[in-house]
């Protein structure tokens, strides 16, 4: 298996798609990488020569923030917002949606599973 930024990319897929398995590389960055290194996006990973793989690896390592570095940067950004007390930091701290989504209904991913709250008791029959 070919490795890029410490991630094994699948051999059977097209290079353009296989590169998206690396955290921080989506379709657009994948296409830009292949254009810069002169590799055909439709080539399968198993058909890449060693020189092409090395060129892709070097381009990604030198020009794109990926995997651990990117994760650390995102976590640092969130921590900074929480510390300086911005609205977004407050939303992160409370575990609510950060980007203005509604919370009256939905937002279950951020809020977690529903917790039952005792409603109004019905008067019992005597």
Swiss-Prot record:
InterPro entries, A to Z: Rbsml_uS13_C, Ribosomal_uS13, Ribosomal_uS13-like_H2TH, Ribosomal_uS13_bac-type, Ribosomal_uS13_CS
GO CC field: cytosol; small ribosomal subunit
GO MF assignments: rRNA binding; structural constituent of ribosome; tRNA binding
BP GO annotations: translation
Biased amino acid composition, Basic residues: 108-126
Keywords: Ribonucleoprotein, Ribosomal protein, RNA-binding, rRNA-binding, tRNA-binding
Ranges where the record places region Disordered: 91-126
Family matches, as Pfam families: Ribosomal_S13
NCBIfam families per the UniProt record, alphabetical: uS13_bact
Family to which this protein belongs: Belongs to the universal ribosomal protein uS13 family.
Record's function text: Located at the top of the head of the 30S subunit, it contacts several helices of the 16S rRNA. In the 70S ribosome it contacts the 23S rRNA (bridge B1a) and protein L5 of the 50S subunit (bridge B1b), connecting the 2 subunits; these bridges are implicated in subunit movement. Contacts the tRNAs in the A and P-sites.
Quaternary data: Part of the 30S ribosomal subunit. Forms a loose heterodimer with protein S19. Forms two bridges to the 50S subunit in the 70S ribosome.
PANTHER family on file: 30S RIBOSOMAL PROTEIN S13/40S RIBOSOMAL PROTEIN S18, SMALL RIBOSOMAL SUBUNIT PROTEIN US13M
Protein name in UniProt: Small ribosomal subunit protein uS13
């Amino acid at each position: 298996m070919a490795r890029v930024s410490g991630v094994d990319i699948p051999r059977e897929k097209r290079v353009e798609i296989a590169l998206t398995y690396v955290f921080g590389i989506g379709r657009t960055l994948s296409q830009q990488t292949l254009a810069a290194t002169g590799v055909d996006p439709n080539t399968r990973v198993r058909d890449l020569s060693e020189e092409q793989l090395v060129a892709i690896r070097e381009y990604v390592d030198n020009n794109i923030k990926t995997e651990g570095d990117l994760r650390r940067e995102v976590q640092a950004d969130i921590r900074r917002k929480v510390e300086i007390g911005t609205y977004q930091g407050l939303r992160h701290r409370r575990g609510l949606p950060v980007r203005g989504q509604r919370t009256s209904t939905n937002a279950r991913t951020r809020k977690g599973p529903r917790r039952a709250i005792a409603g109004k008791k019905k008067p019992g029959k005597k």
